Design a protein with these regions (language model features):
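N-terminal glycine-/serine-/threonine-rich phosphate-binding loop
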Residues: 1-51, 57-63
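An acidic- and aromatic-residue-enriched active-site/binding cleft used to recognize and process polar
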Residues: 51-52, 108
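Ligand-binding beta-strand-loop-alpha-helix segment within the catalytic cores
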Residues: 64-169
Length: 169
């Protein structure tokens, strides 16, 4: 029986630092090389990722708040999953490996009465300018890098697609 590794990284890991001048594709290519190394050692690999910065960027573009946070989370999961899958599948094919990729959006059930909704703490999106801080109608908190928009981060009750994840693994 093959061992299974869970390769997890945050949404910030999917962005190139500004001073490096790279793009997300270059970052993904580097990350995927680690995954291929695990596959070549005969491990099964499950990749999971964060998306805080990406969600924040989409929220910032949605001035009228036309979409709920869950919609932007799903949109970024799809975008990131697509990019990861494309990069990984290309490397697998170049190395003539038999594995195939699958992307799964994951929904989490939370308690609507969770106190986290009253005290948003999860930073999303970029560091905000002082002008944005003064005019934005959002919850904002000071972080190590500067002020950022924050959203609620309630405790998960269950992963709604857990049975599908178990079937894939």
């Amino acid at each position: 029986m093959r061992k299974t590794a869970v390769y997890a990284f945050g949404g910030n890991a999917l962005q190139s630092p500004v001073d490096e001048g790279g793009d997300a594709s270059e970052v993904l290519a580097r990350v995927m090389s680690d995954v291929i190394d695990l596959l070549e050692m005969d491990w099964s690999v499950v990749i999971t990722h964060g998306n805080g910065p990406q969600v924040g960027h989409l929220l910032a573009m949605d001035d009228q708040q036309t979409q709920g946070l869950d919609s932007w989370v799903a949109a970024t999961q799809g975008m990131i999953g697509h990019e990861l899958s494309m990069h990984l599948q290309a490397i697998l094919e170049r190395r003539r490996r038999p594995e195939r990729t699958a992307v799964l959006l994951t929904r989490v059930e939370v308690d609507k009465n969770d106190e986290a909704f009253a005290w948003p703490t999860k930073p999303v999106g970029p560091v905000l300018s002082s002008q944005t801080v003064m005019t934005a109608d959002w919850d904002i908190a000071e972080t190590v890098h500067g002020p950022r928009r924050v959203v609620a981060s309630p405790l998960p009750i269950r992963i709604m697609e857990l049975d599908v994840i178990q079937q894939l693994v």
